[in-house]
């Protein structure tokens, strides 16, 4: 394999599965770990109402993940199809379009959450004791939704290019920054 060649087109599937599985599993473990760290910090500093507030807001994290995966995996699949056809120009346009969609949808979600925050929190099950905590937490964290969405989608696009370790490194840096900012 040439150094600049994408391994997805030239290496055996068994080798690719091993090479892709380890960084992906590490990234998932890191993600789970920093969610646990968040809960520990919030529980110790605010208490059970703080933990309840983050749980009420959690569906919005899943929306971010869903949007990121939708655009990231879709863009990555089309990127790989184009690369398989030896059409790098169209492959680049799919990546560019995916990144644009990630950013645009991230901003739209952030604005929608800011505009409809209280009704959303009530819809997600916030009680009178928790609603103010949930709104405060979500108003702050929603500012980061565009970045989260671009990161999730971008890591799929990076992996499609065969840059597994770089994708994993980006996830690790995100987890470390998240922990420090807590």
Model regions and ranges:
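Short alpha-helical transmembrane segments in multi-pass integral membrane proteins
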Residues: 1-24, 79-146
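Residue-level signal for short hydrophobic patches within transmembrane helices
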Residues: 10, 14-33, 37, 60-67, ...
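Transmembrane alpha-helix boundary and packing residues in multipass membrane permease domains
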Residues: 24, 28, 40, 44, ...
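Alpha-helical transmembrane segments of multipass membrane proteins
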Residues: 36-39, 111, 119, 153-157, ...
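Interfacial/gating helices of multi-pass transporter permease domains
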Residues: 42-62, 129-133
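Small-residue-rich hydrophobic transmembrane alpha-helices
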Residues: 51-111, 148-167
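Alpha-helical transmembrane segments of multi-pass membrane transporters
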Residues: 113, 152, 166-182
